[in-house]
């Protein structure tokens, strides 16, 4: 198995419904996403994947949906819609609280399989840094 990793950075805001400290309030992070993909063999050029393809597909999706957006729990739709209508702010809703864990799981299990379904590689690992010192891995 041969693995390759691509790093993507994006800025987004979120809040955690029901959290008992400051994370219950709207706040933002400079997220760093590391996507590790794997294949059994390289292609005829000796690559698992052209890193440009990962950039085009994964970073393209992240830029369109997450970058400079609010990532909210679908239970926060009232707040999200008010912010969106007053400011034009992009809002992305998750089924669960937008913790780093849930964002990483959403990307690995729901988004990336669809983005990469026609490719000869698969996503093995997602690492999402919420801060330079804190990350989750799925």
Curated annotation (Swiss-Prot):
The gene is queD. The active site is at residues 23, 68, 130. Belongs to the PTPS family. QueD subfamily. Zn(2+) binds at residues 14, 27, 29. Its EC number is 4.1.2.50. One of its GO terms (biological process) is queuosine biosynthetic process. Its cofactor is Zn(2+). Binds 1 zinc ion per subunit. It catalyses: 7,8-dihydroneopterin 3'-triphosphate + H2O = 6-carboxy-5,6,7,8-tetrahydropterin + triphosphate + acetaldehyde + 2 H(+). The keyword Lyase applies. The active site is at the interface between 2 subunits. The proton acceptor Cys is on one subunit, and the charge relay system is on the other subunit. This is 6-carboxy-5,6,7,8-tetrahydropterin synthase. The keyword Cell cycle does not apply. Keywords: Lyase, Metal-binding, Queuosine biosynthesis, Zinc. It holds the Pfam family PTPS. Catalyzes the conversion of 7,8-dihydroneopterin triphosphate (H2NTP) to 6-carboxy-5,6,7,8-tetrahydropterin (CPH4) and acetaldehyde. One of its GO terms (molecular function) is 6-carboxytetrahydropterin synthase activity. It is an enzyme of class 4 (lyase). Signal peptide: none annotated. It comes from the Bacteria. It comes from Rickettsia bellii (strain RML369-C). Pathway: Purine metabolism; 7-cyano-7-deazaguanine biosynthesis.
